[in-house]
Amino acid sequence: MMKESSKWIAAFVEIIIENGDWTETDRYYLTNRIAKLVGCDFFEQPEAVACEQEPLRVVEHLLNIAQANHQIDDSITEAEQLEAELMDFITPTPTIINQKFMDYYQESPRKATDYFYQLCKTNNYIKTKAIAKNIIFPMDSPYGKLEITINLSKPEKDARKILAEKKMSQKKYPACMLCMENEGYYGRVNYPARTNHRIIRLNLEDEAWGFQYSPYAYYNEHAIFLDQQHREMKIEKKTFQRLLKITELFPEYFVGSNADLPIVGGSILSHDHYQAGRHTFPMDLAPMEKRFSLKKYPEITAGILKWPMSVIRLQSDRQEELVEAAELILTKWRNYSDERVSVRAYSKDGTPHHTITPIARRKGSLFELDLVLRDNNVSEEFPDGIFHPHPEVQHIKQENIGLIEVMGLAILPPRLAQELREVEKYLLKQPNQIAESHRAWADELSQQTITEANVKEVIQQGIGTIFVQILTDAGVFKRDEEGRRAFERFIQCIEND
Protein backbone atom coordinates (compact mmCIF):
# COMPACT_ATOMS: atom_id res chain seq x y z
CA MET A 1 0.00 0.00 0.00
CA MET A 2 2.87 2.38 0.87
CA LYS A 3 4.51 1.94 -2.54
CA GLU A 4 1.17 2.28 -4.32
CA SER A 5 0.38 5.49 -2.42
CA SER A 6 3.84 6.92 -3.11
CA LYS A 7 3.47 6.12 -6.81
CA TRP A 8 0.29 8.18 -7.18
CA ILE A 9 1.50 11.01 -4.95
CA ALA A 10 4.63 11.29 -7.09
CA ALA A 11 2.57 11.14 -10.28
CA PHE A 12 0.35 13.99 -9.13
CA VAL A 13 3.30 16.11 -8.03
CA GLU A 14 4.72 15.64 -11.52
CA ILE A 15 1.45 16.86 -13.03
CA ILE A 16 1.35 19.86 -10.67
CA ILE A 17 4.84 20.97 -11.68
CA GLU A 18 4.08 20.50 -15.37
CA ASN A 19 0.67 22.20 -15.33
CA GLY A 20 0.77 24.75 -12.54
CA ASP A 21 2.98 27.67 -11.57
CA TRP A 22 5.27 25.45 -9.50
CA THR A 23 8.89 24.52 -10.17
CA GLU A 24 11.29 21.71 -9.32
CA THR A 25 12.23 23.63 -6.17
CA ASP A 26 8.70 22.99 -4.87
CA ARG A 27 8.79 19.19 -5.28
CA TYR A 28 9.42 18.25 -1.61
CA TYR A 29 6.91 20.82 -0.42
CA LEU A 30 4.23 19.55 -2.80
CA THR A 31 4.94 15.91 -1.98
CA ASN A 32 4.43 16.52 1.73
CA ARG A 33 1.31 18.61 1.19
CA ILE A 34 -0.33 15.96 -1.01
CA ALA A 35 0.73 13.13 1.33
CA LYS A 36 -0.87 14.92 4.27
CA LEU A 37 -4.12 15.50 2.39
CA VAL A 38 -4.51 11.81 1.55
CA GLY A 39 -3.46 10.60 5.00
CA CYS A 40 0.06 9.32 4.30
CA ASP A 41 2.76 10.03 6.90
CA PHE A 42 5.47 8.30 4.90
CA PHE A 43 6.64 8.68 1.30
CA GLU A 44 9.06 6.59 -0.74
CA GLN A 45 10.20 8.09 -4.02
CA PRO A 46 9.34 5.52 -6.72
CA GLU A 47 12.04 4.44 -9.16
CA ALA A 48 9.81 5.53 -12.03
CA VAL A 49 6.97 8.03 -11.86
CA ALA A 50 3.64 6.76 -13.24
CA CYS A 51 3.21 7.97 -16.80
CA GLU A 52 -0.51 8.74 -16.37
CA GLN A 53 -0.90 12.39 -17.34
CA GLU A 54 -4.67 12.78 -16.96
CA PRO A 55 -5.08 14.75 -13.69
CA LEU A 56 -8.56 13.42 -12.93
CA ARG A 57 -7.47 9.78 -13.21
CA VAL A 58 -4.56 10.37 -10.82
CA VAL A 59 -6.79 12.27 -8.40
CA GLU A 60 -9.27 9.38 -8.41
CA HIS A 61 -6.45 7.10 -7.20
CA LEU A 62 -5.56 9.66 -4.51
CA LEU A 63 -9.19 9.78 -3.36
CA ASN A 64 -9.16 6.00 -2.97
CA ILE A 65 -5.98 6.27 -0.89
CA ALA A 66 -7.52 9.00 1.27
CA GLN A 67 -10.61 6.87 1.88
CA ALA A 68 -8.49 3.83 2.79
CA ASN A 69 -6.59 6.05 5.25
CA HIS A 70 -9.86 7.36 6.72
CA GLN A 71 -9.09 10.92 5.66
CA ILE A 72 -12.49 11.07 4.01
CA ASP A 73 -15.61 8.96 4.34
CA ASP A 74 -17.43 7.36 1.44
CA SER A 75 -19.74 10.35 0.91
CA ILE A 76 -19.77 12.29 -2.34
CA THR A 77 -19.41 15.56 -0.41
CA GLU A 78 -16.05 14.77 1.19
CA ALA A 79 -14.69 13.22 -2.00
CA GLU A 80 -15.64 16.31 -4.03
CA GLN A 81 -14.12 18.62 -1.43
CA LEU A 82 -10.80 16.77 -1.43
CA GLU A 83 -10.83 16.50 -5.22
CA ALA A 84 -11.28 20.27 -5.57
CA GLU A 85 -8.54 20.89 -2.99
CA LEU A 86 -6.13 18.65 -4.91
CA MET A 87 -7.05 20.20 -8.25
CA ASP A 88 -6.38 23.62 -6.77
CA PHE A 89 -2.66 22.76 -6.91
CA ILE A 90 -2.76 22.80 -10.72
CA THR A 91 -4.89 25.96 -10.80
CA PRO A 92 -3.09 29.33 -10.78
CA THR A 93 -4.25 31.97 -8.32
CA PRO A 94 -6.98 34.39 -9.42
CA THR A 95 -4.42 37.16 -9.95
CA ILE A 96 -2.21 35.03 -12.20
CA ILE A 97 -5.15 33.62 -14.19
CA ASN A 98 -6.57 37.08 -14.80
CA GLN A 99 -3.18 38.37 -15.93
CA LYS A 100 -2.66 35.43 -18.28
CA PHE A 101 -6.18 35.83 -19.65
CA MET A 102 -5.57 39.50 -20.43
CA ASP A 103 -2.20 38.71 -22.00
CA TYR A 104 -3.84 36.16 -24.30
CA TYR A 105 -6.70 38.58 -24.99
CA GLN A 106 -4.22 41.09 -26.42
CA GLU A 107 -3.48 38.47 -29.08
CA SER A 108 -7.15 37.56 -29.63
CA PRO A 109 -10.34 36.92 -27.63
CA ARG A 110 -10.28 33.34 -28.92
CA LYS A 111 -6.83 32.67 -27.43
CA ALA A 112 -7.99 34.04 -24.08
CA THR A 113 -11.14 31.93 -23.91
CA ASP A 114 -9.29 28.84 -25.19
CA TYR A 115 -6.75 29.23 -22.36
CA PHE A 116 -9.38 29.64 -19.65
CA TYR A 117 -11.68 26.92 -20.99
CA GLN A 118 -8.87 24.36 -21.23
CA LEU A 119 -7.72 25.19 -17.70
CA CYS A 120 -11.25 24.69 -16.31
CA LYS A 121 -11.43 21.28 -18.00
CA THR A 122 -7.95 20.23 -16.86
CA ASN A 123 -8.66 21.03 -13.21
CA ASN A 124 -12.10 19.38 -13.47
CA TYR A 125 -14.02 22.51 -12.53
CA ILE A 126 -15.92 21.69 -15.71
CA LYS A 127 -17.19 18.21 -14.87
CA THR A 128 -16.34 16.57 -18.18
CA LYS A 129 -16.80 13.02 -16.86
CA ALA A 130 -20.26 13.79 -15.47
CA ILE A 131 -21.28 15.75 -18.57
CA ALA A 132 -20.36 12.79 -20.77
CA LYS A 133 -23.17 10.80 -19.11
CA ASN A 134 -25.83 13.10 -20.57
CA ILE A 135 -28.02 11.60 -23.29
CA ILE A 136 -28.05 13.87 -26.36
CA PHE A 137 -29.84 13.49 -29.68
CA PRO A 138 -31.10 15.79 -32.48
CA MET A 139 -34.69 15.93 -33.69
CA ASP A 140 -36.08 17.23 -36.98
CA SER A 141 -39.01 19.61 -36.58
CA PRO A 142 -40.94 22.21 -38.60
CA TYR A 143 -38.55 24.73 -37.01
CA GLY A 144 -35.32 23.03 -37.98
CA LYS A 145 -33.20 20.49 -36.14
CA LEU A 146 -33.82 20.81 -32.39
CA GLU A 147 -31.46 19.46 -29.70
CA ILE A 148 -32.61 17.15 -26.89
CA THR A 149 -30.59 16.49 -23.73
CA ILE A 150 -31.50 14.23 -20.84
CA ASN A 151 -29.46 15.76 -18.06
CA LEU A 152 -27.73 13.11 -15.94
CA SER A 153 -25.06 15.40 -14.51
CA LYS A 154 -27.09 17.94 -12.55
CA PRO A 155 -30.26 17.64 -10.42
CA GLU A 156 -33.49 19.31 -11.54
CA LYS A 157 -35.42 22.02 -9.69
CA ASP A 158 -39.12 22.79 -9.76
CA ALA A 159 -40.56 26.29 -10.02
CA ARG A 160 -41.68 26.45 -6.38
CA LYS A 161 -38.23 25.52 -5.08
CA ILE A 162 -36.66 28.20 -7.28
CA LEU A 163 -39.01 30.82 -5.85
CA ALA A 164 -38.31 29.64 -2.28
CA GLU A 165 -34.55 29.87 -2.85
CA LYS A 166 -34.95 33.42 -4.12
CA LYS A 167 -36.53 34.38 -0.79
CA MET A 168 -34.00 32.50 1.36
CA SER A 169 -30.77 33.29 -0.46
CA GLN A 170 -29.94 36.53 1.38
CA LYS A 171 -28.96 34.66 4.59
CA LYS A 172 -26.31 32.35 3.14
CA TYR A 173 -22.57 32.38 2.61
CA PRO A 174 -21.87 32.39 -0.20
CA ALA A 175 -25.14 34.21 -0.80
CA CYS A 176 -25.78 32.03 -3.86
CA MET A 177 -24.00 29.70 -6.30
CA LEU A 178 -23.05 32.62 -8.56
CA CYS A 179 -21.50 35.00 -6.04
CA MET A 180 -17.81 35.78 -6.40
CA GLU A 181 -17.13 34.58 -2.86
CA ASN A 182 -17.51 31.06 -4.27
CA GLU A 183 -13.99 31.43 -5.68
CA GLY A 184 -11.88 29.12 -3.49
CA TYR A 185 -14.79 28.16 -1.18
CA TYR A 186 -14.22 24.73 0.38
CA GLY A 187 -17.84 23.63 0.25
CA ARG A 188 -20.17 21.96 2.75
CA VAL A 189 -23.03 19.50 2.85
CA ASN A 190 -25.49 20.42 0.09
CA TYR A 191 -23.13 23.07 -1.26
CA PRO A 192 -20.47 22.23 -3.87
CA ALA A 193 -16.72 22.50 -3.39
CA ARG A 194 -15.26 25.47 -5.26
CA THR A 195 -11.61 25.44 -4.14
CA ASN A 196 -10.45 25.14 -7.77
CA HIS A 197 -12.95 27.71 -9.07
CA ARG A 198 -11.67 30.86 -10.79
CA ILE A 199 -13.39 33.96 -12.18
CA ILE A 200 -12.14 36.41 -14.81
CA ARG A 201 -12.80 40.04 -13.84
CA LEU A 202 -14.42 42.29 -16.44
CA ASN A 203 -15.64 45.85 -16.74
CA LEU A 204 -19.09 45.94 -18.32
CA GLU A 205 -20.55 49.39 -18.84
CA ASP A 206 -18.51 50.73 -15.88
CA GLU A 207 -19.63 47.90 -13.59
CA ALA A 208 -17.59 45.06 -12.08
CA TRP A 209 -18.61 41.71 -13.55
CA GLY A 210 -17.13 38.23 -13.66
CA PHE A 211 -16.74 35.59 -16.37
CA GLN A 212 -16.60 31.88 -15.62
CA TYR A 213 -17.55 28.57 -17.18
CA SER A 214 -20.44 26.41 -16.04
CA PRO A 215 -19.33 23.24 -14.23
CA TYR A 216 -22.25 21.38 -15.81
CA ALA A 217 -22.10 22.53 -19.42
CA TYR A 218 -25.12 21.99 -21.63
CA TYR A 219 -23.30 23.04 -24.81
CA ASN A 220 -19.84 23.97 -26.07
CA GLU A 221 -17.96 26.47 -23.85
CA HIS A 222 -21.03 27.11 -21.70
CA ALA A 223 -20.04 30.35 -19.98
CA ILE A 224 -21.60 32.57 -17.31
CA PHE A 225 -21.22 36.32 -16.91
CA LEU A 226 -22.17 37.44 -13.41
CA ASP A 227 -22.60 40.69 -11.55
CA GLN A 228 -20.05 41.20 -8.76
CA GLN A 229 -22.92 42.45 -6.60
CA HIS A 230 -25.50 39.96 -5.36
CA ARG A 231 -28.62 41.58 -6.79
CA GLU A 232 -31.72 40.13 -8.40
CA MET A 233 -32.18 39.42 -12.08
CA LYS A 234 -33.53 42.48 -13.85
CA ILE A 235 -34.26 42.98 -17.54
CA GLU A 236 -33.75 46.65 -18.37
CA LYS A 237 -31.94 48.97 -20.78
CA LYS A 238 -28.59 48.17 -19.17
CA THR A 239 -29.21 44.47 -19.85
CA PHE A 240 -29.21 45.09 -23.59
CA GLN A 241 -26.14 47.33 -23.28
CA ARG A 242 -24.21 44.67 -21.38
CA LEU A 243 -25.23 41.83 -23.70
CA LEU A 244 -24.12 43.72 -26.80
CA LYS A 245 -20.90 44.77 -25.08
CA ILE A 246 -20.13 41.12 -24.32
CA THR A 247 -20.57 40.22 -28.00
CA GLU A 248 -18.16 43.04 -28.81
CA LEU A 249 -15.61 41.70 -26.32
CA PHE A 250 -16.16 38.06 -27.32
CA PRO A 251 -17.50 38.12 -30.89
CA GLU A 252 -17.54 34.32 -31.24
CA TYR A 253 -19.88 33.90 -28.26
CA PHE A 254 -23.63 34.33 -28.12
CA VAL A 255 -24.91 35.70 -24.81
CA GLY A 256 -28.39 35.82 -23.34
CA SER A 257 -30.28 36.44 -20.14
CA ASN A 258 -33.02 34.47 -18.49
CA ALA A 259 -36.22 36.36 -17.82
CA ASP A 260 -36.52 38.12 -14.48
CA LEU A 261 -39.89 36.74 -13.34
CA PRO A 262 -40.82 33.41 -11.71
CA ILE A 263 -42.25 30.62 -13.92
CA VAL A 264 -40.69 32.09 -17.08
CA GLY A 265 -37.26 32.73 -15.53
CA GLY A 266 -34.27 30.46 -14.98
CA SER A 267 -33.26 28.44 -11.93
CA ILE A 268 -31.49 31.37 -10.21
CA LEU A 269 -33.43 34.64 -9.96
CA SER A 270 -31.53 36.05 -6.99
CA HIS A 271 -28.30 37.00 -8.82
CA ASP A 272 -28.08 38.94 -12.07
CA HIS A 273 -26.20 36.87 -14.63
CA TYR A 274 -26.07 35.90 -18.29
CA GLN A 275 -25.24 32.67 -20.11
CA ALA A 276 -23.01 32.51 -23.15
CA GLY A 277 -20.91 30.17 -25.23
CA ARG A 278 -19.57 29.03 -28.56
CA HIS A 279 -22.64 27.24 -29.87
CA THR A 280 -25.13 27.69 -32.69
CA PHE A 281 -28.63 27.03 -31.38
CA PRO A 282 -31.61 26.05 -33.53
CA MET A 283 -33.20 29.46 -32.94
CA ASP A 284 -30.06 31.18 -34.29
CA LEU A 285 -30.85 29.64 -37.67
CA ALA A 286 -34.57 30.48 -37.64
CA PRO A 287 -35.58 32.85 -40.46
CA MET A 288 -37.64 36.01 -40.15
CA GLU A 289 -41.06 35.06 -41.53
CA LYS A 290 -42.54 38.56 -41.33
CA ARG A 291 -40.52 41.77 -41.41
CA PHE A 292 -41.62 45.14 -40.10
CA SER A 293 -40.08 48.57 -39.65
CA LEU A 294 -39.61 50.79 -36.62
CA LYS A 295 -40.46 54.40 -37.38
CA LYS A 296 -37.85 55.78 -34.94
CA TYR A 297 -35.15 53.38 -36.10
CA PRO A 298 -35.42 52.94 -39.88
CA GLU A 299 -31.87 51.54 -40.12
CA ILE A 300 -32.75 48.55 -37.95
CA THR A 301 -33.87 45.33 -39.62
CA ALA A 302 -36.76 43.90 -37.60
CA GLY A 303 -38.95 40.85 -37.95
CA ILE A 304 -40.92 38.03 -36.36
CA LEU A 305 -39.09 34.70 -36.27
CA LYS A 306 -40.46 31.43 -37.54
CA TRP A 307 -40.31 29.82 -34.11
CA PRO A 308 -42.82 28.17 -31.72
CA MET A 309 -42.29 30.94 -29.16
CA SER A 310 -42.97 34.63 -29.84
CA VAL A 311 -39.67 36.18 -30.91
CA ILE A 312 -38.75 39.57 -32.40
CA ARG A 313 -35.34 39.81 -34.06
CA LEU A 314 -33.46 43.10 -34.43
CA GLN A 315 -30.29 43.58 -36.52
CA SER A 316 -28.04 46.60 -36.92
CA ASP A 317 -24.41 47.66 -36.93
CA ARG A 318 -25.29 50.38 -34.40
CA GLN A 319 -25.33 49.19 -30.81
CA GLU A 320 -26.95 52.31 -29.37
CA GLU A 321 -29.93 52.16 -31.71
CA LEU A 322 -30.41 48.46 -31.00
CA VAL A 323 -30.45 49.17 -27.26
CA GLU A 324 -33.02 51.93 -27.66
CA ALA A 325 -35.24 49.81 -29.92
CA ALA A 326 -35.04 46.87 -27.52
CA GLU A 327 -35.94 49.13 -24.60
CA LEU A 328 -38.93 50.44 -26.57
CA ILE A 329 -40.19 46.90 -27.21
CA LEU A 330 -39.59 45.89 -23.57
CA THR A 331 -41.52 48.92 -22.28
CA LYS A 332 -44.39 48.32 -24.69
CA TRP A 333 -44.55 44.63 -23.82
CA ARG A 334 -44.49 45.22 -20.07
CA ASN A 335 -47.64 47.31 -20.39
CA TYR A 336 -49.41 45.44 -23.18
CA SER A 337 -52.60 43.45 -22.67
CA ASP A 338 -54.84 41.59 -25.10
CA GLU A 339 -57.68 39.80 -23.33
CA ARG A 340 -58.65 38.05 -26.57
CA VAL A 341 -55.60 35.79 -26.18
CA SER A 342 -55.29 35.80 -22.35
CA VAL A 343 -52.38 38.26 -22.40
CA ARG A 344 -52.47 40.47 -19.29
CA ALA A 345 -49.64 42.80 -18.31
CA TYR A 346 -50.70 43.24 -14.67
CA SER A 347 -52.90 41.60 -12.07
CA LYS A 348 -55.56 43.67 -10.33
CA ASP A 349 -53.14 44.14 -7.43
CA GLY A 350 -50.49 45.57 -9.77
CA THR A 351 -48.28 42.46 -9.99
CA PRO A 352 -46.35 42.60 -13.30
CA HIS A 353 -46.50 39.57 -15.60
CA HIS A 354 -44.57 40.56 -18.73
CA THR A 355 -40.86 40.48 -19.44
CA ILE A 356 -38.41 39.42 -22.14
CA THR A 357 -35.76 36.73 -22.59
CA PRO A 358 -33.08 38.55 -24.64
CA ILE A 359 -30.28 36.93 -26.66
CA ALA A 360 -27.41 38.77 -28.40
CA ARG A 361 -24.94 37.56 -31.01
CA ARG A 362 -22.71 38.82 -33.81
CA LYS A 363 -23.42 38.16 -37.48
CA GLY A 364 -20.35 39.51 -39.23
CA SER A 365 -20.39 43.29 -38.77
CA LEU A 366 -23.97 43.20 -37.50
CA PHE A 367 -25.18 42.97 -33.93
CA GLU A 368 -28.30 40.84 -33.49
CA LEU A 369 -30.83 40.83 -30.66
CA ASP A 370 -33.59 38.25 -30.27
CA LEU A 371 -36.34 39.37 -27.89
CA VAL A 372 -38.54 36.51 -26.67
CA LEU A 373 -41.84 37.73 -25.22
CA ARG A 374 -42.69 36.09 -21.87
CA ASP A 375 -45.85 36.09 -19.73
CA ASN A 376 -46.04 34.38 -16.31
CA ASN A 377 -49.80 34.59 -15.70
CA VAL A 378 -51.56 31.61 -14.13
CA SER A 379 -55.19 30.53 -14.23
CA GLU A 380 -57.50 27.91 -12.74
CA GLU A 381 -56.98 25.79 -15.84
CA PHE A 382 -53.20 26.28 -15.81
CA PRO A 383 -52.09 26.90 -12.20
CA ASP A 384 -48.42 26.31 -13.11
CA GLY A 385 -48.56 28.96 -15.82
CA ILE A 386 -50.69 29.75 -18.85
CA PHE A 387 -47.51 30.02 -20.94
CA HIS A 388 -45.68 27.15 -19.26
CA PRO A 389 -45.57 23.43 -20.15
CA HIS A 390 -49.19 22.29 -19.92
CA PRO A 391 -50.24 19.24 -17.85
CA GLU A 392 -50.35 16.85 -20.81
CA VAL A 393 -46.60 17.30 -21.45
CA GLN A 394 -45.40 17.51 -17.84
CA HIS A 395 -44.64 13.80 -17.74
CA ILE A 396 -41.63 14.80 -19.88
CA LYS A 397 -40.89 18.32 -18.61
CA GLN A 398 -42.53 20.34 -15.83
CA GLU A 399 -39.73 22.78 -15.00
CA ASN A 400 -39.40 26.38 -16.16
CA ILE A 401 -38.57 27.03 -19.81
CA GLY A 402 -35.42 29.09 -19.52
CA LEU A 403 -33.00 30.74 -21.90
CA ILE A 404 -31.35 27.57 -23.22
CA GLU A 405 -34.61 25.79 -23.99
CA VAL A 406 -36.10 28.93 -25.52
CA MET A 407 -33.31 28.67 -28.11
CA GLY A 408 -34.18 25.07 -28.98
CA LEU A 409 -32.05 22.90 -26.68
CA ALA A 410 -34.22 20.79 -24.37
CA ILE A 411 -32.82 20.07 -20.91
CA LEU A 412 -34.86 17.14 -19.66
CA PRO A 413 -34.74 15.71 -16.12
CA PRO A 414 -32.59 12.68 -15.19
CA ARG A 415 -35.62 10.62 -14.12
CA LEU A 416 -36.41 10.13 -17.82
CA ALA A 417 -33.38 7.93 -18.46
CA GLN A 418 -34.86 5.06 -16.43
CA GLU A 419 -38.49 5.87 -17.16
CA LEU A 420 -37.94 5.75 -20.92
CA ARG A 421 -36.34 2.32 -20.64
CA GLU A 422 -39.62 1.14 -19.16
CA VAL A 423 -41.55 2.85 -21.97
CA GLU A 424 -39.33 0.97 -24.42
CA LYS A 425 -40.20 -2.36 -22.75
CA TYR A 426 -43.88 -1.42 -22.76
CA LEU A 427 -43.82 -0.72 -26.50
CA LEU A 428 -42.05 -4.03 -27.12
CA LYS A 429 -44.68 -5.79 -24.99
CA GLN A 430 -42.05 -6.95 -22.52
CA PRO A 431 -42.48 -7.09 -18.71
CA ASN A 432 -42.19 -3.50 -17.52
CA GLN A 433 -42.84 -0.98 -14.77
CA ILE A 434 -43.98 1.93 -16.91
CA ALA A 435 -44.84 5.08 -14.96
CA GLU A 436 -48.56 5.75 -15.13
CA SER A 437 -47.81 9.31 -16.27
CA HIS A 438 -46.29 7.94 -19.50
CA ARG A 439 -48.93 5.33 -20.32
CA ALA A 440 -51.26 7.47 -22.48
CA TRP A 441 -48.30 8.81 -24.45
CA ALA A 442 -46.87 5.31 -24.87
CA ASP A 443 -50.25 4.10 -26.15
CA GLU A 444 -50.14 6.85 -28.79
CA LEU A 445 -46.64 5.79 -29.82
CA SER A 446 -47.77 2.17 -30.01
CA GLN A 447 -49.98 3.03 -33.00
CA GLN A 448 -46.78 3.00 -35.06
CA THR A 449 -44.97 -0.13 -36.17
CA ILE A 450 -42.60 -0.88 -33.28
CA THR A 451 -39.58 -3.17 -33.51
CA GLU A 452 -36.45 -3.64 -31.42
CA ALA A 453 -34.57 -1.90 -34.23
CA ASN A 454 -36.66 1.29 -34.24
CA VAL A 455 -38.12 1.59 -30.73
CA LYS A 456 -35.49 4.06 -29.48
CA GLU A 457 -35.96 6.25 -32.55
CA VAL A 458 -39.75 6.22 -32.12
CA ILE A 459 -39.41 7.31 -28.48
CA GLN A 460 -36.88 10.02 -29.32
CA GLN A 461 -39.09 11.37 -32.09
CA GLY A 462 -41.98 11.35 -29.64
CA ILE A 463 -39.94 13.35 -27.13
CA GLY A 464 -39.00 15.81 -29.86
CA THR A 465 -42.65 16.31 -30.77
CA ILE A 466 -43.44 16.98 -27.12
CA PHE A 467 -40.57 19.49 -26.90
CA VAL A 468 -42.07 21.43 -29.81
CA GLN A 469 -45.39 21.41 -27.94
CA ILE A 470 -43.65 22.61 -24.77
CA LEU A 471 -42.17 25.57 -26.65
CA THR A 472 -45.57 26.22 -28.23
CA ASP A 473 -47.18 26.19 -24.77
CA ALA A 474 -44.61 28.77 -23.64
CA GLY A 475 -45.27 30.95 -26.68
CA VAL A 476 -47.46 33.95 -25.90
CA PHE A 477 -48.88 34.37 -29.40
CA LYS A 478 -49.74 30.95 -30.79
CA ARG A 479 -48.88 29.77 -34.28
CA ASP A 480 -52.52 29.60 -35.41
CA GLU A 481 -54.38 32.35 -37.27
CA GLU A 482 -55.72 33.93 -34.07
CA GLY A 483 -52.22 34.02 -32.58
CA ARG A 484 -50.71 35.55 -35.72
CA ARG A 485 -53.29 38.32 -35.76
CA ALA A 486 -52.66 38.97 -32.05
CA PHE A 487 -48.89 39.18 -32.64
CA GLU A 488 -49.48 41.64 -35.49
CA ARG A 489 -51.60 43.82 -33.19
CA PHE A 490 -48.67 44.06 -30.79
CA ILE A 491 -46.26 44.83 -33.64
CA GLN A 492 -48.53 47.68 -34.75
CA CYS A 493 -48.18 49.18 -31.26
CA ILE A 494 -44.40 49.43 -31.61
CA GLU A 495 -44.04 50.16 -35.34
CA ASN A 496 -45.19 53.76 -35.22
CA ASP A 497 -44.03 54.73 -31.74
UniProtKB/Swiss-Prot annotation:
This enzyme's EC code(s): 2.7.7.12
GO MF terms, alphabetically ordered: UDP-glucose:hexose-1-phosphate uridylyltransferase activity
Keyword Cytoplasm: yes
UniProt keyword list: Carbohydrate metabolism, Cytoplasm, Galactose metabolism, Nucleotidyltransferase, Transferase
InterPro entries per the UniProt record, alphabetical: GalP_uridyl_Trfase_II, GalP_uridyl_Trfase_II_CS, GalP_Utransf_C, GalP_Utransf_N
Pfam families noted in UniProt: GalP_UDP_tr_C, GalP_UDP_transf
GO biological process, one term: galactose metabolic process
Annotated HAMAP family: GalP_UDP_trans
Name of the protein in question: Galactose-1-phosphate uridylyltransferase
Taxonomic lineage: Bacteria, Bacillati, Bacillota, Bacilli, Lactobacillales
Annotated gene: galT
